[in-house]
């Protein structure tokens, strides 16, 4: 039997992710037995979904502070709906920890998406202003990969 569930970020809040939003999502999520996460949205949605691939019963803050073992137990398919965040190809998730009024980042290989699917039609529905700013963001990320002191063989090969 195929079991599926759809959770909407708007149910948990809007804007940039917070630990409170992720904890509410985790509470609902842990009531099921999911093998795969499909995150369709911008960077905030994908960043929140990255935490869902991890094992355990911890609160969001414990994951971001690395107070618990970080073990990936689910696959993540990321489908971005903007063109600038890059969350679908990074191992980083950022959230605000409300108790300290500050953002924390988690950068570990366990939260890389297993697959990223780019669907150009999803960008057609973006308001022009949002499309333009996210496209500029994507362009800046591309430049950054060339000038970064952490450039790698992939980006170095593209310079010639």
Residue ranges and their predicted role:
Residues 6-19:
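Short beta->alpha junction loops
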Residues 95-159:
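Carboxylate- and glycine-rich phosphate/diphosphate-binding segment that chelates Mg2+/Mn2+
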């Amino acid at each position: 039997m195929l079991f599926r569930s759809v959770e909407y970020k708007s149910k948990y809040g809007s804007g940039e992710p917070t630990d409170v939003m992720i904890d509410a999502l985790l509470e609902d999520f842990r009531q099921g037995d999911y093998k795969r996460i499909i995150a369709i949205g911008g960077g905030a949605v994908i960043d929140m979904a990255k935490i869902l691939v991890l094992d355990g019963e911890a609160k969001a803050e414990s994951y971001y502070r690395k107070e618990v073992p970080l073990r990936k137990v689910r696959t993540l398919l990321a489908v971005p709906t903007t063109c600038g965040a890059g969350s679908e190809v990074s191992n980083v998730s950022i959230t605000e920890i409300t108790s300290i009024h500050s953002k924390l980042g988690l950068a570990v290989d366990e939260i890389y998406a297993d697959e990223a699917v780019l669907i150009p039609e999803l960008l057609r529905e973006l308001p022009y202003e949002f499309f333009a700013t996210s496209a500029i963001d994507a362009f800046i990320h591309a430049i950054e990969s060339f000038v970064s002191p952490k450039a790698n063989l992939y980006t170095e090969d593209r310079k010639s």
